[in-house]
Amino acid sequence: MKEVLQQFKQNYLIKYWNPVAAVIAAGLISAYYFGVTGTYWAVTGEFTRWGGHALQALGVDVSDWSYYKIIGMQGTIFTRIDGVMILGMFAGCISAALWANNVKWRNQPHKRRIVQALIGGALAGFGARLAMGCNLASLFTGIPQFSVHAWFFTIATAVGTYAGVKVTLLPIFRVKLELKKGAAKLQETDPKQANRRFWIGMVVFFAYLIASLYVMTNSIKLGFAMLCGLAFGLLIERAQICFTSAFRDLWVTGRAYMAKAIIFGIIVGTLGVFSYIQLGVPAKIMWAGPNAIIGGLLFGFGIVLAGGCETGWMYRSMEGQVHFMWVGLGNVIGSTYLAYAWDDLAPVLALDYEKLNLLKSFGPVGGLLVNYGLLILCLIAVVWWERHFLKKAKAKIAAANSSQACGC
């Protein structure tokens, strides 16, 4: 029995999980999350509220800011669905990282990288809230809502990440590597420390799990949000789910593994969300205007500049990577600034444009088919790009080898 438990611990709590299975699971859970809570899996809206609360603590009156009237400032992080869900994500991330002994304080020695993290995080936060959602609400959980704005945002994000890759490869963003004499010594794992951390992770996990179940006895929505947040946190940390790497890998190495996983997750989530919409849960539809396109461009560029998206910085910061704590701070700053600038930007970029719903434009069955058709086109495009990129890379290697062989 002990051997079986040890094998389970090694295979499922310490080793990384298969990203495809994890993202599909996230898509399925996000559909249930929508059905029970009436909202989608999203994080930057709550980050914007955190910024609003911080300003209020400093004496700034944000009660007449239109953006906060749209997203709502009622309650606290402990009484809002988004708030307790995000707390659950952090609890899940730290639990999973502790199980695998993957927690280590890793400071950022280069000031240039800190500036990148702050600016990139701020651009991503600003862009996400301009588009009314980040890689979750305007992509992973936005597309299953059948909102056209999510498609605008997704395409713009892809373009933004491509531009971000080109810019971050410039010499100005490179840091000098310091070479030290002698072979580097690998730090040995302390079995006692690893075991201690594993049980601390278990305490955090079960404490939040029990709290979730207790809250469910009084509020199904809040308790279920806590439970889903815990699951989301486990999934993104153990499978290292990062939308930045999904896009960046396409442009840098041609690898499409994570991008394909995300598409599969959306395909699964779409059917679940569609079912709940047909049962009467209202879809979350946002303005399909320039705000979604500009927001996507800024978000895509920002996450590459920063090195991580919203889900990425959350789990990496829980692993002790200080760089991503700066990214998170930048996110809050950028999203809060968008709330401040919304009244000037919204009339031109958002409010004069329709909230387009594929289910209303094409009917329930037609909208579902259009959404799936677009997802299949995305999958075909990603597979084609992967093969095209790798074919070009192999041709370059073959040409280089040929030149060396002939002495050119």
Residue ranges and their predicted role:
Residues 1-408:
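Membrane-interfacial helix-loop segments of redox and metal-homeostasis proteins
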